[in-house]
C-alpha cells in the first residue's frame, strides 16, 4: 500500500475505495455509533494513503464538545473531557467543515493539543455539527494532502449519516402508517344485489 512518503496519491481512486468501504458498514443503531465505526474503519484501512493515523470523537454538549472515544493510534484520552465550542480551531472547523492548523497558527493552544497527544489540529465537522472528529497526522504528510484526506472523510461520513437518517424517517413513517390502519378489514353487513327484469 502506498504511504504518504510515496505521494502523489490518486485521490479520485482513494475516494472511491473509501466510499466502497463505507457502503459495507451496516447500520449500528445511532449516529454516534455510526460516526465512530466509520471513522475507525476508514483509518484502519487507509491510514497510509490518508496520512491520518488515529483520532478522537467529540460530541456537542451545550457550549462544549466532549470526548466520547479515541481510535487508531491516538493517545488515550479520558472520556468526558471537554473543549469549548469557542476554541478557535473548533470554531474554524464548525465554520468551514474542515480545518488544519499548525502549532504556531493563531488561536492554537499548544499545551492543550500536546495533552491530547498531537501537534497539529486537523479535524472535520459531521452530522450537522453534532460531532467533530480530530485526527492525529502522519508527520511526513503535507498540509494539502491532509486537507484532501479530511474532505474525503467528511464527505463519506456525512453521506452515511444522511443515508441512515433518511432510512429512519421512512421506518418511522411506516410505523405511523401501520398504527393508523386497521389490523384486519372491518366487517360489513351482507348485502343483496337485485337485478331488475327488463319489460318490453
Placement of each model-derived feature along the sequence:
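Acidic/proline- and glycine-rich, intrinsically disordered low-complexity segments
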Residues: 71-106
Amino acid at each position: 500500500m502506498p504511504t504518504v512518503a510515496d505521494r502523489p496519491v490518486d485521490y479520485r481512486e482513494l475516494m472511491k475505495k473509501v466510499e466502497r468501504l463505507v457502503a459495507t458498514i451496516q447500520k449500528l443503531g445511532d449516529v454516534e455509533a455510526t460516526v465512530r465505526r466509520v471513522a475507525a474503519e476508514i483509518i484502519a484501512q487507509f491510514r497510509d494513503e490518508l496520512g491520518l493515523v488515529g483520532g478522537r470523537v467529540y460530541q456537542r454538549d451545550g457550549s462544549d464538545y466532549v470526548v466520547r472515544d479515541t481510535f487508531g493510534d491516538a493517545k488515550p484520552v479520558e472520556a468526558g473531557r471537554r473543549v469549548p465550542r469557542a476554541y478557535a480551531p473548533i470554531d474554524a472547523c464548525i465554520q468551514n467543515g474542515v480545518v488544519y492548523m499548525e502549532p504556531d497558527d493563531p488561536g492554537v493552544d499548544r499545551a492543550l493539543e500536546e495533552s491530547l497527544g498531537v501537534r497539529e489540529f486537523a479535524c472535520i465537522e459531521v452530522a450537522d455539527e453534532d460531532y467533530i472528529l480530530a485526527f492525529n497526522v502522519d508527520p511526513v504528510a503535507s498540509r494539502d494532502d491532509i486537507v484532501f484526506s479530511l474532505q474525503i472523510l467528511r464527505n463519506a461520513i456525512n453521506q452515511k449519516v444522511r443515508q441512515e437518517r433518511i432510512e429512519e424517517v421512512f421506518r418511522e413513517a411506516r410505523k405511523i402508517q401501520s398504527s393508523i390502519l386497521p389490523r384486519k378489514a372491518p366487517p360489513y353487513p351482507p348485502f343483496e344485489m337485485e337485478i331488475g327484469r327488463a319489460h318490453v
